[in-house]
Amino acid sequence: MSDLTKTIKLRIHVTPEQEVLFRQMTEQYRQACNFVSQYIFDNQFDLTYQSLNKKLYSSLRGLFGLKSQLAQSSIKTTIARYKTVKQQLFQNPYRYKDENGNWQRITKTLEWLWKPVFFSRPQADLVRNRDYSFVDSGQVLSINTLGKRTKC
């Protein structure tokens, strides 16, 4: 059975207190993704989820105050971004003319990167029934933030 992923975007109306909670959560998530990205860059571009989770999970929880699912999602988000960059580099090889005038190509790998992938916008990848859920017959959205669960 294949996995099916659906992405939704919604606009929710929140109180000023909830807005602060969401901004804190998305900013901490962004910083956690940058932390994971720096680790991947410094450690030979290891993109295996299990090894990254083993090495970074407790640091993500402690340094950024992320709940368990958000810590794991930050690792998955960063791995996905590096895999996208890897594919883009592969599709655009380095081309040059050799001494005979023939075009040669060298496949680019992640080692061609000069700096780690950087996450500039606050974001959060939420997992249904873990980070968020619909309650009250689907009329209310309950979202996990850094400190507490809030309903909108």
Feature names for model-found ranges:
Residues 1-152:
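Nucleic-acid substrate recognition interfaces
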